[in-house]
Amino acid sequence: MREVNFSIPNVNKASVNITTTLYDRRALDCTSTLPLINSLNHLAYLTTSSARIRDILTVDGGIERLVCILKEGRSRDLMEMWKWSLAFQCVVNIGVRGSESVRTRVVEADMVPVIATILDNYIKVVEKARARADSESQRHSSRHHSKAAPISSDAPSRPVYVDQSTNTEQRPSRRQAPPPHIEIPPFYQDSHASDSNAMDITSSPRVPVTSPPERSTFGQDAHNLRSNDTRYAHAAHRYRVMQPLATALPPMDAADGFGLRPVRDTERLPSMLPGFQNGLASQPDSPTTPSGPAQLRSNTQVAPARPRPTLRQQQSASGESDDGNGEGSTLGDDPGSGETAEPIVGIQNRMEIDDDGDRQTVLEGVSNTHDLTVNDTSESQEAETFNITHRSTVDGSMINNDATRTNGALGLSPTQAPNTANSPAVVPSPYSLYVRDRSTTAVQGVLTTMPKDEDVLMSLQLLAYVSKYCNLRSYFQHSHLVPKLKVDRELQMLEDGVSPIEPAEEEDEYLLPDDVNIFPLVEKFTVRHHSKDMQYWACVVMRNLCRKDESRGGIRQCAYYKCGKWEEFQRQFAKCRRCRRTKYCSKDCQKAAWVYHRHWCHTTP
């Protein structure tokens, strides 16, 4: 469709647009979404590379137009969401890369309420997720205690050793008395054993710890039993959680696929036959992709037993599927491994008033329910440089906080820790995991209306650059929230799963009082359960609050946000003894502010 007011027929343009070489202010007033997205995409490049374009936008009303686009709110339509994100990127580029006068114009264009609303929405969703995670953890802990009570009461009356024909009741006795060393027979005569025997067959390759293992040897009939007996699917999962694989896997010293040699086609194992390779991608032999000993291939009936290959003829086939991590993640969800998989998750119950200064993250692993999903990948990867690019692709590198303990709980060898040195920074969105279990029709589009991690990070970065000017501090301490950007109704839809019938009451933004102080919102992002990038920029903003106002004689303001007193003369207030940055008018203000100040109070040399 052609826009009547902005069409240029002589150059065959349906509307005026901005290109990488031409800036036209009229393009920002376009009413069609598609050409406006095209113009904003090019404007994002221009605001990054051209200082002149940034200066022009401050005098021709371009910044005000971009802020108006942001205040229209987020829509569930993908194109509208794209338009909002591009406009937000343009404003951030102008404020971060612009001069002092340009940054002042960004604040005067009423950008602070937009940032305050984004931060407030993010905090609300995080608190929702934390409350739900706490309730889930309490429910799981109470269920585990109720299961553990009868076991502990019956334990004294039980014999230490029980008959081999019993099922899983023999597990406590096996933990107390390890089985004796057993020899590996060349053949297994009984191919149809009971469930407990299936577990014994899988344990037969275990060699004594005193003699170092040299290879993974698995019998032909043991593999037949796995493929034919459907009960193995349950027995293997229960057993692999308890089995220390340091005695079942070969050493990783050899770099040529365990140092095993190729075999002839006539002497291949059944797992290496062509029938087992259908649909499996070929993978190179490497120490990080071994053929797992307990991988389930398929339920296909195998050929009769053949003579087992000699020790020199066994090899880790390149066509075997490397699904060790997938099996390990399944073990974490297995109900039978309740107390074994429990230490994987460490959820912090309180957010701000714990005095544990050495705590790394709120989540030390990955929870099964993914309720509290504010994951700090910077903690696990020990990031040395700041990278604002946040990708939402989830891979296995996000669970490398404690490789030895986590891999041991998942049934993986410690030598198989994923190599994340060259892996990209992975920051999963807290909203995608929070909404994942609420995928009803009424809430499918709710995710697009909420701020993402990169939106919060760019908001904090923009605030860090514009909040260092003391003459603009009143804009930050007396602001408001944008009604069309709030997510209160969307959060209610996530909890209820249905869309509310009554329409939303439209609030006039100009009638709202300026009673929102943005600094307390920013201070909440200094808590350690946020990512390190968020913590860094939030700390920069809070340190800007402690700057002295040179225009007023170099006096400072009390750092407690509920106080806000200014010094009457220089050095009237006392500084914090630890960081030597913040100043407080009294001990009461310092005690009240310490709840959050301790997160960004860093010792100065």
Swiss-Prot record:
Biological-process GO terms, alphabetical: establishment or maintenance of cell polarity; positive regulation of flocculation; sporulation resulting in formation of a cellular spore; ubiquitin-dependent protein catabolic process
Domain of life per record: Eukaryota
Biased composition (Polar residues): 279-302
Sequence segments annotated as region (Disordered): 133-227, 268-342
PROSITE patterns the UniProt entry points to: ZF_MYND_1, ZF_MYND_2
Major localisation: cytoplasm
Cellular component per GO, a single term: MUB1-RAD6-UBR2 ubiquitin ligase complex
Zinc finger residue extent: MYND-type: 560-601
Keywords carried by this UniProt record: Cytoplasm, Metal-binding, Sporulation, Zinc, Zinc-finger
Biased composition (Low complexity): 202-216
SUPFAM superfamilies, A to Z: ARM repeat, HIT/MYND zinc finger-like
InterPro entries (UniProt xref): ARM-type_fold (IPR016024), MYND-type_zinc_finger (IPR051664), Znf_MYND (IPR002893)
Amino acids binding Zn(2+): C576, C579, H597, C601
GO molecular function: zinc ion binding
Compartments, as annotated in UniProt: Cytoplasm
Function: Involved in determination of the onset of polarized growth and morphogenesis. Plays a role in the regulation of branching in hyphae and spore formation.
Family stated for the protein in its record: Belongs to the MUB1/samB family.
Protein name: MYND-type zinc finger protein samB
